[in-house]
Design a protein with these regions (language model features):
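Phosphate-handling DNA/RNA-contact segment within nucleic-acid enzymes
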Residues: 2-88
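TOPRIM fold recognition
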Residues: 47, 63-143
C-alpha cells in the first residue's frame, strides 16, 4: 500500500465477506468489510473449532501446533455475534481469547450461547496477554 508517495508492505488475512485484516510492524487495520475469518481443516468435517481474537493468535496457535479441526478468527471481539452462525454445528469450541475484560466478555457470551461445548484454553498462556505474547516469550527463552 502507499501513503504520501511512500510504499509500505503488510500481511493481509482474508475474512468471509471479502475484506482483509492488515498487519505490519507499523500498521494495524482492515480493508472493509470487517468480518470473521474461517479456516477449514483439510479432510472430513470437523467437530472442533478453535476461536481466536486475532489472526496473529491464530498463526501463533499454528506455530505451536495447537489447532485441531477448524479455526475461526473473530478479527474483533465486536464480531462475536457474527461468529455464531459459523459455530452452531460444532460439538467442541476451544477458545484462545485474550486475558482482558473484552476476552472474558466474549468467552461469557459464547458460554451463554453454547454452554458446555465451550472450553476456555487460556490457562495455557497464563501470565501473558494473549497467545501471541506467549509464543514470543517461549521463543525467546529457547534462543
Amino acid at each position: 500500500y502507499g501513503v504520501r508517495g511512500k510504499r509500505y508492505f503488510a500481511v493481509g488475512f482474508p475474512n468471509v465477506t471479502g475484506g482483509y485484516e492488515i498487519r505490519s510492524r507499523f500498521f494495524k487495520g482492515c480493508v472493509p468489510p470487517k468480518d470473521v475469518s474461517l479456516v477449514k481443516a483439510e479432510g472430513s468435517p470437523a467437530d472442533v473449532c478453535s476461536v481466536f481474537e486475532g489472526f496473529m493468535d491464530f498463526l501463533s496457535a499454528a506455530t505451536l501446533g495447537l489447532e485441531k479441526g477448524d479455526c475461526l478468527v473473530l478479527n474483533s471481539v465486536a464480531n462475536v455475534e457474527k461468529a455464531m452462525r459459523y459455530l452452531d454445528g460444532y460439538g467442541c469450541i476451544d477458545c484462545y481469547l485474550d486475558h482482558d475484560a473484552a476476552g472474558r466478555r466474549t468467552l461469557k457470551t459464547l458460554k451463554g450461547h453454547y454452554g458446555e461445548r465451550v472450553y476456555d484454553r487460556s490457562a495455557l498462556y497464563d501470565g501473558c496477554k494473549d497467545l501471541n505474547e506467549y509464543l514470543q516469550l517461549t521463543t525467546k527463552k529457547e534462543q
